[in-house]
Amino acid sequence: MKITILTIGKRHEPWVEPGIKRFLERLRAPFAAEMIIIPHSGQIGDRARQDESERLMSRLKPHDFIILLDERGRNLSSPELSRLILDHTDQHIVIIIGGAYGVTETLHRRADIVWSLSRLVFPHQL
């Protein structure tokens, strides 16, 4: 099984890189894992949301299991997240983190689950 973290953003601050590397190494023990950073669009508002969502969606395959991170999503406990992942080990799991302006409704509907880590919005480094 493969897990891809697909995010809009830029290269992380040097102090963040070791944490991301360690997290991906821990994921790689049971899974093939990667992080793909797609650059910000350079637009603002709705234009940025549309452009970035299109670029995110262009990376998706029809049978990918999509988890979209969004503050309006469901809160999951660790056992619930574990069960969700185990139930989809036969699929490529893609975790999407949108840009500052969020994602389009089209991408929202494409997600198999919308997951909220918190009702707060955090910088990508976290």
Map each language-model feature to its residues.
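Post-transcriptional modification and biogenesis factors for structured RNAs
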Residues: 1-126
